[in-house]
Amino acid sequence: MYARRKYDLKKILYVDIDAHHGDGVFYEFEHDPDLIIADIHEDGSFLYPGTGFESETGSGAAKGTKLNLPLSPGATDRDFISAFTKIEDFIESMKFELIIFQCGADGLSGDPLTHLKYSDKSHEYAAQVLHRIAHEKSGGRIIGLGGGGYNTENLATAWNKVVEVFASENLT
């Protein structure tokens, strides 16, 4: 991984809130204990790629360093925030030097390809929590990456919220 080589980092936290399970990242790093993965997505029983079940927690030395939180179709901000608190609990005792936040916006209500019903408040909440955690645990190092989102208005609104939070000095 580029960030490891370039900046001599050992442990990285990757948080993915795209509606689709991040199967490419998950399965590439399934055996890697130095990439902690937390992924909230629509249940794979209802949405492509059909992966990301709670029982998938990593393998070998990486067992327990991966967290999949599939949500039922129709999940709202309340469901998202409840799941996100599980991420907070999951990473509480872990050490990492960088957070990578994949902030796909296809979980927002009105997306034509998914069945989740979040508002931009979910993105804002996730960004606030990760921003605070980055300053507490990884020297403020956090990267926000775009992801899926097939309603352009939702996409712009959600990503704007993330940028606003990351640019602020408020760590609530």
Regions found by a protein language model. Name each.
Residues 150-172:
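C-terminal active-site-proximal or functional interface alpha/beta core segments in diverse enzymes
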Residues 144:
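Rossmann-like dinucleotide/flavin-binding elements
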Residues 1-136, 163-167:
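Conserved alpha-helical scaffold segments that buttress catalytic/binding sites
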